[in-house]
Design a protein with these regions (language model features):
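Intrinsic-disorder/low-complexity regions
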Residues: 4-6, 17, 45, 60, ...
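Preference for short coil/turn "hinge" residues that link or interrupt alpha-helices
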Residues: 20, 50-53
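Short, compact, well-ordered microdomains
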Residues: 52-70
Length: 70
């Protein structure tokens, strides 16, 4: 089972809100981990890690990517 397939069966337990728009999305544990990695990489200036995280997150949940990170 691929990560994308496994992600479809995970419960959406983590509510994340875009601080600029106020819109929220419910994320799986996997998506939440990528979101946290992206925001941490952004704060620390690790743009290579941030870009990899953005790519992976957007492939797992395009709607949440557009709401939270785009």
């Amino acid at each position: 089972m691929t990560e994308k397939e496994r992600n479809k069966t995970e419960p959406r337990e983590h509510k994340v809100t875009n601080p600029y728009s106020g819109q929220s999305e419910m994320l799986t544990a996997t998506e939440y981990a990528y979101y946290f990695l992206i925001k941490y990489a952004e704060r620390t200036g690790d743009y290579n890690a941030m870009q990899k995280g953005l790519s992976k997150f957007s492939s797992l949940n395009a709607k949440a990517y557009m709401t939270l990170l785009d």
